[in-house]
Amino acid sequence: MERIAVLAYSGGLDTSCCLKLLEDKYGYKVVSVCVDVGQPEEEIKEVEEKAKKLGVLKHYTIDAKEEFVKDYIFRAIKANAMYEGYPLSTALARPLIAHKVVEIAEEVGAEAVAHGCTGKGNDQFRFETTIRIKAPHLKIIAPIRDLNLTRAEEIEYAKEKGIPIPTESKKYSIDENLWGRSIEGSELENPDFVPPEEIYAWTKNPVEDKEEEIVEIEFKEGVPVAINGEKLEPVELIKKANEIAGKHGVGRIDIIEDRIIGLKSRENYECPGAVLLLTAHKALEQLVLTRDELRFKEIVDSLYGELIYKGLWFDPLREDLDAFIDKTQERVTGTVKVKLFGGTARVVGRDSPYALYSKELVSFDEKEIDQKELAGMVKYHGLQAMLYEMRKKRK
């Protein structure tokens, strides 16, 4: 009986070497899986062709774009999910990819699943945690990490096995899905190196933006449903948000990020649609939620982002947090106007049938609130600080 390993396959050097290593070093027949979460269409086709040329038993291409948006991105929006200023585009997709790989592994009766992650990055945690949660009986193999291979050793092995290598090695490592694009490697590893314009593909150079644009985002119970009055299907809405914000240079992110294992890394991202939608969503929450709800939700949102980053999407705590978040989102319905210009996204208007803002109460020209009645409240505001100061003076 054939021993089968299912490989999460991207078509890059790491996973292509994994494919052959699984055959040579581990004795497996390989089934490859590419999960489409918004990569370029031509890349998806190239991956399939390459897998077949390298002799896989079978290759699966799974279109998971709609599931990614509805079950992952929309939940991240409702949670204002960020990690150290980054909208979690790469991290958010990994549990879904790993879950799909597990489903194929169970379908084909595989003994093992494999990935091409190295030992220094975050993805090893994200893939393996999901796999162990969903299918603890499956063996996990990470050839690049487990064999401690360097990039040079991988290239040498690829030449030996006839794995196609571009004549010019890719300068940067790029990961792309509907929620964003990450660029790393080469000179970008120097935190003082100024990124060249060539690394960007989704966003226009902000200094070249000559005309501002006001875009209106409509939300229903925390989920974006329309842009500029046009109702859009989930995948199309995210694509549209990326397109509109990207042409104004919105969503360029350059940060020093704390990885799971403790390393600090320099990361560059393009997340135009994410920045636009998260900015609008947060503004609408400020209009409809109470002060105490907002304060507590900030804590929940921060924890939610950390769970995503650490690969704990399927942890029960995430479901618990969703229960609270979903309750708050019942009133997050309305529209937000965002001005886009020169790399910035600035909220300039918001409206909701659930708004807690009252023009009559807040206006200096109205008498809905009897100002005299506030004197007593003001008198005892900061009472503990006053008592503390009195005690100090007695000493």
Curated annotation (Swiss-Prot):
- Catalytic activity, as annotated: L-citrulline + L-aspartate + ATP = 2-(N(omega)-L-arginino)succinate + AMP + diphosphate + H(+)
- The enzyme class is ligase
Sites where the protein binds ATP: A8, Y9, S10, G11, G12, L13, D14, T15, S16, G116
**Annotated L-citrulline binding sites:** Y86, N122, R126, S173, S182, E257, Y269
Q: Which NCBIfam families does its entry note?
A: argG, PRK00509.1, PRK13820.1
Tell me the Gene Ontology biological-process terms attached to this UniProt entry: argininosuccinate metabolic process; L-arginine biosynthetic process; urea cycle
Pathway given in the UniProt record: Amino-acid biosynthesis; L-arginine biosynthesis; L-arginine from L-ornithine and carbamoyl phosphate: step 2/3
Provide this UniProt record's keywords sorted from A to Z: Amino-acid biosynthesis, Arginine biosynthesis, ATP-binding, Cytoplasm, Ligase, Nucleotide-binding
Which positions are annotated as binding L-aspartate? T118, N122, D123
Give its E.C. classification number.
6.3.4.5
CDD domains (UniProt xref)? ASS
Q: Where in the cell is it found?
A: Cytoplasm
Q: Which Pfam families match?
A: Arginosuc_syn_C, Arginosuc_synth
The UniProt subunit note reads as follows:
Homotetramer.
Give an example GO molecular function.
argininosuccinate synthase activity
Give me the gene this protein comes from. Answer: argG
Identification of the protein by name: Argininosuccinate synthase
Naming one, the record's GO cellular component terms include: cytoplasm
